[in-house]
Amino acid sequence: MSGIVIAIVVLTILALVFGVLLGFAAEKFKVEGNPLVDQVEALLPQTQCGQCGYPGCRPYAEAIANGDKINKCPPGGTATMEKIADLVGVDPEPLNATEAVQEKKVAFIREDECIGCTKCIQACPVDAILGSGKLMHTVITDYCTGCDLCVAPCPVDCIDMLPIEQTTKTWDWQLNAIPVKQVQEEPQC
């Protein structure tokens, strides 16, 4: 056999042996994550806005799993906080005064002043802003969470945070807060 064939065979055998060893080591030393973190993260709104004091929803979910307060997520609101409280097994708390949003707001771009720099698009964590370079931008209000992250990067200050007009579509019906009483039927004669 030639030297090249021997080298190829030896390298192939070494690759297979090391592959088997790495596969075994990966299974043997596997690190399990906290399943509570994944469950809490699934309940959070995934806006990655940072209003809770953490850089995103995953770090906040990890903090909640480690015992941090559950009432720091303004975009999620009271409904999300109550679901997390039920999951974690703690009493629901009202949103912190510093985190609580008095009224829901959305971004509004004054299009006649917009220079199309795209800095607001890059800052928006939920892709609620449409536009492209050197063209006017606009906000999709149904997607906007009101996180306010698009306002600061705007070099011409053409973004305002405006309150949402209350309609039947935007009203918080709080259907989970309606008390339901179970009534037993009495046997009839």
Swiss-Prot record:
Q: Which Pfam families match?
A: Fer4_21, FeS
- Entry superkingdom: Bacteria
* Cofactor: how and how many bound: Binds 3 [4Fe-4S] clusters.
Q: Which InterPro entries match?
A: 4Fe-4S_dom, 4Fe4S_Fe-S-bd, 4Fe4S_Fe_S_CS, Elect_transpt_cplx_RnfB/RsxB, RnfB/RsxB_Proteobac, RnfB_subfamily
Q: Which GO terms describe its molecular function?
A: 4 iron, 4 sulfur cluster binding; electron transfer activity; metal ion binding
Q: Which parts of this chain are annotated as the region Hydrophobic?
A: 1-26
- Give the binding site residues for [4Fe-4S] cluster 1: C49, C52, C57, C73
Q: List the disulfide bonds.
A: none
| Ranges of residues in domain 4Fe-4S | 32-90
Instruction: Spell out the subcellular localization from the entry.
Output: Cell inner membrane
Question: Where do the annotations place [4Fe-4S] cluster 3 binding?
Answer: C124, C144, C147, C150
GO CC annotation, single: plasma membrane
Task: Write out the GO biological process terms.
Answer: electron transport chain
Primary location class: membrane
User: What is its EC class?
Assistant: translocase
Q: Which UniProt keywords apply?
A: 4Fe-4S, Cell inner membrane, Cell membrane, Electron transport, Iron, Iron-sulfur, Membrane, Metal-binding, Repeat, Translocase, Transport
Q: Which cofactor does it need?
A: [4Fe-4S] cluster
User: What are the 4Fe-4S ferredoxin-type domain coordinates in residue numbering?
Assistant: 105-134, 135-164
Give its E.C. classification number: 7.-.-.-
Q: How does it assemble?
A: The complex is composed of six subunits: RnfA, RnfB, RnfC, RnfD, RnfE and RnfG.
What family does this chain come from, according to its entry?
Belongs to the 4Fe4S bacterial-type ferredoxin family. RnfB subfamily.
Functional note: Part of a membrane-bound complex that couples electron transfer with translocation of ions across the membrane.
This chain belongs to which protein, by name? Ion-translocating oxidoreductase complex subunit B
Give the gene symbol: rnfB
